C-alpha cells in the first residue's frame, strides 16, 4: 500500500498547493500515506466492530439535527468528504436515524473485493447502491413514499476531470 498511486498523489498535491516547495509537498505526501494506512486499518476493523464501539468512535455533535431532518418527512442526502473512515457514517443509526439508509459506492472491478467492501460498508443497517443504480432507487422510493437517507462522497471527480 505504501506508494499507492504515487505519481497521482504527488501531482494532485502540486495542483492543490502550487505555493509549496518540493520538500513541503513531500511532507504532506508522507502524512497522506500515514492517514491512508490508518483508513485501511479502520476499514478492516469495521468488519468486526460492534455498534457500541462504533458509536464511541463516530460522535455526532448535534444529534438533534437528525431529529429535525426526520421531522420534515422528506428523504435526504448526506454528503461526506472522502476523508477518514466515512464508512462509519453508518453509526447514524445508533443516534436515532430511522430512515432506511443507502450508501452510494463505485463498483469495484474485482468481484471479490467488491463483495468484501459492500459487506463491510453495509454491516450496520445500510444498503449499498452502485452509483448507476442510485437514480432508479431514489425514484422507486419516492413513488412508494418510502423515506430514505442517501450517503454520498462529495469530493470525488468523474474520470478524466482534472483541474488545470
Each predicted region: which residue ranges?
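Membrane-proximal helical "anchor" segments flanking the first transmembrane region
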Residues: 1-77, 84-85
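Soluble catalytic domains of membrane acyltransferases
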Residues: 47-164
